[in-house]
């Protein structure tokens, strides 16, 4: 309402891939995250519902008050300068930190069977995508993410390979998690991958940097943070 009163020219809302229905993400090899698949709505978390309701709120203000809205559904943005410890970090930072802090010949935990799939977009690519979206005249929700899907175990192995260490992955799930941490394993959906066809069609741009290159940059930054903490 304040934006209407102040006559704000353009508004960006950062939504999330978590808005997509759980039933479209049960196949780790072929998840459906096309923008039009958001309805019938059934996000797998309260966070996803909050993001979806907010999208509808912004679109209502667009229809009723003429606000100029841009909505991006982010898919796992990562990179240096982000949270990397304490339990609130995302998977890329967690994998890098574990590979850095685990001794050569040791092992680190990966919750679940590691077969879940995800995609991750480096922060520089995300910023460029947002800039191009804001400069466009496209006003519908659109994915901003990478289409380079990877299993969680392979993602952990990527961090290990970057470290140059001999580290084994210990998949922890089921009763083993409950016995050790006293809560169920939080796995999320089985598969999630950005579908960038709409962005390419309407905005005319696509991501270029590989996941491995982004992980190498993130790894080096987190390594410096760990050295400072020693």
Predicted regions located by residue number:
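NAD(P)-dependent short-chain dehydrogenase/reductase
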Residues: 23-31, 46, 56-134, 147-149, ...
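A short small-residue
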Residues: 35-37, 75-77, 195-198
């Amino acid at each position: 309402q304040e934006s209407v009163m102040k006559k704000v020219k353009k508004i960006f809302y950062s939504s999330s891939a978590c808005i997509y229905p759980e039933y479209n993400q049960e196949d780790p090899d072929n998840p459906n995250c096309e923008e039009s698949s958001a309805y019938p709505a059934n996000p797998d978390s309260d966070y996803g519902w909050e993001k979806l309701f907010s999208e509808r709120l912004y679109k209502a203000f667009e229809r009723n008050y003429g606000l100029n809205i841009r909505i991006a559904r982010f898919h796992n943005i990562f990179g240096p300068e982000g949270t990397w410890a304490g339990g609130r970090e995302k998977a890329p930072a967690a994998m890098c930190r574990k590979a850095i802090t685990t001794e050569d010949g040791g092992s680190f935990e990966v919750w679940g069977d590691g077969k879940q799939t995800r995609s991750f977009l480096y922060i520089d690519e995300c910023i460029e995508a947002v800039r191009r979206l804001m400069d466009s005249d496209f006003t519908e929700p659109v994915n901003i993410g990478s289409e380079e899907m990877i299993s969680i175990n392979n993602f952990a192995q990527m961090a290990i390979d970057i470290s140059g260490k001999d580290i084994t992955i210990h998949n922890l799930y089921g009763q083993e998690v409950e016995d050790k941490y006293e809560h169920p394993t939080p796995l999320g959906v089985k598969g999630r991958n950005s579908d960038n066809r709409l962005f390419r069609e309407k905005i005319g741009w696509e991501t270029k940097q590989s996941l491995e290159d982004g992980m190498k940059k993130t790894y080096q930054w987190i390594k410096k943070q760990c050295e400072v903490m020693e």
